[in-house]
Regions:
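Conserved ATP-binding subdomain of kinase catalytic cores across diverse folds
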Residues: 85-190
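Regulatory N- and C-terminal appendages and interdomain linkers associated
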Residues: 2-99, 127
Length: 190
């Protein structure tokens, strides 16, 4: 009986060790989307481009230990480059104004208004879980468990759900994936 107990204790210690190791792959909590084939974002005139290739985030890439302990999730979807149109707020629907900053505990967003008083929301694909990480997790260096949990969410789920809602004839939002470069209209939100 003691041998079985020791065996399970050793297995538990190994599992905890592997879990802790798997959380040490990054110390970042939030990372902006990555532009593909653009080395210096400040040297690019995005007004000359109609679209760019962007990966939502490479923050969730994992080695085999991390995949074993925390799962495959949607890691490939987060790091796969997609072609998205470039959007400027001064030309969107004849120009929009920023009403206020929004966002819950995970996303960064801006509430926009068109000249026709139509309200829009500009929301980041990337999640920022900083507010969700408990202090004890930060103290123990385990914040990556919370951060990595985001890899279980598909980065483009809102687009897929809207399409399904359309087929089901259910009222829904109409999300579009765009790239918003630095611009005068964004002012201090750049």
């Amino acid at each position: 009986m003691k041998r079985i107990l020791y065996f399970f204790i050793i297995l538990l210690i190994i599992a905890l060790g592997l879990l802790y190791w798997s959380t040490s792959s990054t110390d970042q909590v939030f990372k902006k989307s990555e532009l593909i084939n653009i080395k210096n974002i400040n040297s690019v005139d995005f007004k000359t481009k109609d679209s760019v290739l962007v990966a939502a985030s490479d923050l969730y890439q994992a080695d085999e230990v991390k995949k074993l302990m925390q799962g495959e999730q949607y890691r490939k979807a987060w790091s796969t480059p997609v072609k998205v149109p470039v959007m400027y707020l001064d030309t969107l629907f004849g120009g929009v104004t920023i009403e206020k900053e929004g966002g819950g505990k995970q996303t960064h967003s801006l509430k926009l208004k068109t000249k026709n008083d139509i309200e829009l929301t500009l929301r980041s694909v990337n999640k920022d879980p900083e507010a969700l990480i408990p202090e004890f997790a930060k103290t123990l260096g385990l914040e990556n468990i919370v951060v990595d949990g985001i890899s279980a969410q598909h980065p483009y789920a809102a687009i897929l759900v809207a399409k399904l809602a359309e087929y089901a004839k259910v009222h829904h939002t109409k999300p579009k994936l765009v790239f918003v470069p630095k611009q005068k209209t964004l002012d201090n939100y750049n």
